[in-house]
């Protein structure tokens, strides 16, 4: 598991350096095997089962494509993109004035996973799509997997 997380981190950071040989076309290069299928991955968090990663995939305003949050199972190497967040919440953790979910323009950048004082898991995601905000989500276990429930947002102060 640790090796897969390390390898995924190297793949995600692959564009940050200038290696002598690059993996292209999603083909292995020597002992390096890329994990393909992500779209502009930005950040990741290891979830409580120590096998699932939550990964932010930033959209592209240049091409009009939204981003997403995705789950990556490190054992089966499967990617599950979470649905767009269009449903309002029945409970708000962010600013009282933020009651509209990010919708289909959602484009997450950095993410953070933490446990709230009440014991529930919280995911914060910096959003650059549709609005500049920090979106609040509750991480929920569902069967043998996970899902996120939108719980509000924090918006920048207007000057």
Regions found by a protein language model. Give the residues of each.
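A short helix->beta-strand "capping" segment at the edge of beta-propeller domains
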Residues: 18-40, 93, 148
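Beta-strand-rich domains and repeat architectures in extracellular enzymes and scaffolds
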Residues: 33-68
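Surface loop/turn motifs at the tips and blade-to-blade linkers of beta-strand repeat domains
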Residues: 34-37, 83-85, 101-103, 152-158
């Amino acid at each position: 598991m640790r090796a897969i997380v390390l390898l995924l981190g190297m793949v995600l950071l692959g564009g940050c350096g200038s290696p002598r040989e690059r993996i292209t076309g999603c083909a292995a290069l020597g002992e390096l095997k890329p994990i393909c299928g992500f779209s502009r991955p930005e950040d990741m968090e290891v979830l409580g089962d120590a096998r699932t990663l939550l990964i932010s995939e930033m959209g592209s305003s240049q091409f009009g494509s939204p981003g997403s949050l995705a789950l990556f199972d490190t054992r089966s190497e499967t990617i599950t993109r979470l649905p767009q967040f269009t449903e309002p919440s029945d409970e708000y953790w962010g600013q009282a004035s933020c009651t509209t979910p990010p919708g289909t323009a959602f484009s997450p950048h950095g993410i953070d996973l933490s446990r709230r004082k009440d014991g529930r898991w919280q995911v914060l995601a910096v959003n650059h799509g549709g609005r500049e905000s920090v979106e609040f989500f509750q991480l929920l276990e569902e069967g043998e997997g996970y899902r996120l429930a939108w719980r509000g947002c924090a918006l920048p102060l207007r000057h």
